Design a protein with these regions (language model features):
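Catalytic-loop region of hydrolases
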Residues: 28-109, 363
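Accessory cap/linker subdomain of secreted extracellular hydrolases
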Residues: 34-54, 235-332
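Short beta-strand element of the alpha/beta-hydrolase
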Residues: 101, 111-124, 230
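Alpha/beta-hydrolase active-site loop
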Residues: 168-190
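Primarily recognizes the serine-hydrolase "nucleophile elbow" in alpha/beta-hydrolase
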Residues: 183-253
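Short beta-strand/loop motif that positions the catalytic acidic residue
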Residues: 335, 340-347
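Histidine-bearing beta->alpha loop at or near hydrolase active sites
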Residues: 346, 367-388, 392
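Conserved alpha/beta-hydrolase "acid-adjacent" motif
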Residues: 348-354
């Protein structure tokens, strides 16, 4: 009799604990009013991070708050759209908050939904150029690259993977931000998804960087995700090699912006200490700009040289810069998922030799890889490869055998 009572008491206790856990989770998912499209993200309280203590109490990928996108920003193919803030982990292994945009099309089936994680090439040092901000203001030109997925009924999630501090070109912060954005979308009650939902990842340039790092980190950081494949192109495999290639050219802003972005993730790199007086002014200004929006980084710093703004002409070769670069250079883990890499041979920003080496590393470590070097294009036109990348992923969703041209 006593054993029966004890057993019933234990079961009741576990049920209460489970109920309390569920209640806590629901309470953490605060509902905010619909997005005010007139507010820029830098002036919007939704983007204010919870405290470090509040973040530490959540597991990676947990939803913290969410709100609906205004009807005017949805377009004809969408049933609803949401901004979701979630808990992630930065390069220093500290809990941080990030935001993803979840788009649910009218064509989405009631059950058996599939998820495309699209990584924007927003390359920004300000939240105002973030995918979530651009989706609200209808300035996100990249929607053309995943519109056909929406038309087929796929849910799309689009993380602000640089985080609330706009840490541009930071490997773990970006890759883990993507993976936790996927987790958050699966856990978001309005998405109609669950832990068994198949996921594909797609991105180009800065978005390719985030996609590639998510693929490299997935097995160790988020092994439970059912990722069917990743397609990425325009890859900045080695950030310092990219900086050296663009220094003094039209794309020079990418070098200077990357230095500022990395310094936000590595506060021990006090970049102002290395700057000339002109450089100190430029660093502050660069921190308000982005590559694909306004105020624009490329046009403001085209044809500038690092030596114009930094005291040491060998700044990129300094031991502290080389150490940071090693942490943010691809090819540290071989993804366990099928991959496609598409890369312009004539890319004026990303060294093709670095991408060749990355593909060779993956192949040598038994990756399933379709590597597609493309002639006759540059970095801008190379983005057209996203169409083929999406087709690659749709074939993986359909269960077709992944191509592999590793020799």
């Amino acid at each position: 009799m006593n054993r029966t009572v004890n057993r019933l008491t234990t079961i009741a206790g576990l049920a209460c604990a489970g109920a309390l856990s569920m209640t806590t989770l629901v309470q953490a998912q605060q509902v905010y009013p619909t997005v005010d499209a007139k507010l820029k993200p830098t002036a919007d309280a939704f983007y204010t991070s919870p405290t470090s203590g509040e973040l530490a109490a959540e597991v990676p990928g947990n939803v913290l708050r969410y709100r609906a996108l205004p009807a005017a920003s949805l377009g004809t193919s969408l049933k609803e759209g949401w901004q979701v803030m979630y808990r992630s982990t930065n390069t220093k292994n500290q809990p941080v908050a990030m935001v993803t945009t979840v788009l649910i099309p009218k064509a989405a089936p009631a059950t058996g939904r599939k998820l495309l994680s699209y990584q924007s090439f927003y390359d920004s040092l300000t939240l105002d150029c973030s995918p979530s901000g651009q989706a609200t203001s209808n300035t996100l030109l990249e929607k053309t690259f995943f519109q056909s997925a929406l038309n087929k009924g796929y849910i799309v999630t689009m993380a602000d993977y640089e985080g609330l501090e706009s840490q541009w070109i930071v490997a773990k912060n970006s890759g883990q931000g993507v993976l936790d954005g996927i987790r958050a979308t699966l856990r978001f009650s309005n998405s109609g998804l669950n832990a068994l939902t198949p996921v594909g990842m797609l991105g180009y340039s800065g978005g390719g960087f985030a996609t590639a790092w998510a693929a490299e980190l997935a097995a160790g950081y988020a092994p439970e995700l059912k990722i069917i494949g990743a397609a990425q192109g325009g890859l900045p495999v080695n950030p310092i090699n990219v900086a050296k290639k663009v220094d003094g050219g039209f794309w020079a802003g990418a070098y200077l912006g990357a230095v500022v972005g990395l310094s936000r993730a590595y506060p021990e790199l006090k970049v102002e200490d290395y700057a000339t007086p002109e450089g100190i002014v430029a660093i502050k200004d660069i921190g308000t700009r982005c590559l694909t929006g306004s105020p624009n980084l490329l046009t403001a710093y085209a044809y500038k040289k690092g030596s114009d703004l930094l005291k040491d002409p060998n700044f990129l070769n300094l031991p502290e810069m080389q150490a940071i670069n090693r942490e943010n250079t691809m090819g540290q883990n071989t993804p366990k998922i099928p991959l496609q890499i598409f890369q312009s041979i004539g890319d004026q920003v990303m060294p093709i030799a670095d991408v060749d080496s990355l593909a060779a590393y993956y192949c040598a470590n038994n990756a399933t890889l379709e590597y597609k070097p493309v002639a006759g294009t540059d970095h801008v036109l190379g983005a057209m490869g996203l169409s083929g990348g999406l087709t690659y992923l749709l074939n993986r969703f359909d269960g077709k055998v992944a191509p592999n041209n590793c020799k």
